[in-house]
A protein has these predicted regions:
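TPR/TPR-like (Sel1-like) alpha-helical repeat modules
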Residues: 38, 99-122
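Amphipathic alpha-helical segments of tetratricopeptide repeats
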Residues: 37-41, 72-80, 115-118
């Protein structure tokens, strides 16, 4: 099933604005645009592919705004409700947010899975501490 063309165009417009703002480092403004796009998706939102990438974009904005709890909820939603276990980026951000909210052991597990899926290049734009967490974890076994 496809989205209504008018709804799709609205989602696309807000998403493109959000993406431009995001890449300009204007994360709060990008978050507003992504939320507008997400709000346009009809219920049940889980049936629409656009929900997945918008939740990821919203979670990514929260991450860069250092609102790790809100970001964690977005990526938890992707993992649980949308079954995005096979998405390396989802695993990476989920692991980073778990770490930042104090759940280091579970964070290590998800970061290691992300690493095993995509390798070190997935971590290139991340704080180096996340890659070092995996190194320590690999040594500890």
């Amino acid at each position: 099933m496809d989205l209504d063309p008018d709804i799709y165009e609205g989602i696309k417009e807000y998403s493109e604005k959000g993406e431009t703002l995001f890449y300009d480092g204007r994360f709060s403004e990008a978050l507003r645009e992504y939320n507008k796009a997400y709000d346009m998706i009809p219920e049940p939102k889980q049936q629409w592919e656009a929900s997945v990438w918008l939740i990821a974009a919203i979670g990514d904005c929260h991450f860069w705004l250092k609102d790790y709890a809100a970001s964690l909820e977005c990526f938890r939603k992707l993992m649980v409700e949308y079954e995005e276990y096979g998405n390396p980026f989802t695993r990476l951000r989920y692991g980073e947010c778990l770490y930042e909210t104090g759940n280091e052991q579970l964070a290590k597990e998800h970061l290691l899975v992300a690493y095993s899926m995509e390798g070190e290049e997935l971590f290139e734009e991340c704080d180096k501490k996340y890659l070092s967490i995996i190194s320590i974890f690999k040594l500890q076994g």
